[in-house]
Amino acid sequence: MDKRWSLKGMTALVTGGASGIGYAIVEELAGFGARIHVCDISEAKLNQSLSEWEKKGFQVSGSVCDVASRPEREELMQTVSSQFDGKLNILVSNVGVIRSKPTTEYTEDDFAFHISSNVEAAYHFSQLSHPLLKASGYGSIIFVSSIAGVISFDAGSIYGLTKGALIQLAKNLACEWAKDGIRANAVAPNVINTPLSQSYLEDVSFKKALLSRTPLGRVGEPNEVASLVAFLCLPAASYITGQTICVDGGLTVNGFSYQPEEALLSRTSLRRVGEPNEVSSLVVFLCLPAASYITGQMVKPFVLMEV
């Protein structure tokens, strides 16, 4: 096999890898020849998954870890460093938690819950893995974000905030750590068919609305996210960094395709059709001296529908 399309001899850490998208990512990376260490908060799920991978001949080990705990993160990275001789090629920050509520109902505990698991853990793991990734001579970080970090999505504002933060973190690290031979990218899935998303997919009205806005007309599968993650870790993707790629069946680009007016308005935040003077007022402003530092921007009349 062309070495550009192989991970043989490379090492990886996948957080939250015992089920769902994380499980699929482990299988994909292992299939390309990587040696992998997995962490998960559930010891039962982890042991079951490790047993399955052993039967398949994959080189996978694992540790129980609550990524929201700083001491446990540090202990995990010590284990990884020892196991892989101080070198790591791939970090996949996959763990994500969600509590869906209206913004006015979120509590301080809800905020801390999302930030510690979705943002702080990813940030700290990046810091801890930096010397190992640098030592490998070929490092790749993948943040599993969400379309909720790209567009407004009915999943809770705090969740969207945390997933958007991962996208920006990928951009920053891509620039800051390029000199160390480390790439950083994010993948942003739509709702994927995993145990975590079943409560949403069992909601008939939610699923109908979701699929009506997804051009491919179906829910994605975990291996459809995992295949992109694996590609971004391959030498074949060596010039791709700082990017966010949506794995969403086309949802985020479906700004306006023909549909009945009621369907159009259901996708428009203000729930009405715009007027010509609401566009012309912006055009006039952009021509004024007051807009003298605005240039090269694309202003979309349908912006409220597309966000």
UniProtKB/Swiss-Prot annotation:
Coiled coil: none
Residues where NADP(+) binds: 13-37
Residues annotated to bind substrate: S146
Keywords of this entry: NADP, Oxidoreductase
GO molecular function, one term: oxidoreductase activity
The EC number(s) this enzyme carries: 1.1.1.-
Record bears the keyword ATP-binding: no
Pfam family, one: adh_short_C2
CC annotations in GO: cytosol; peroxisome
Similarity section: Belongs to the short-chain dehydrogenases/reductases (SDR) family. SDR65C subfamily.
Protein name according to UniProt: Tropinone reductase homolog At2g29340
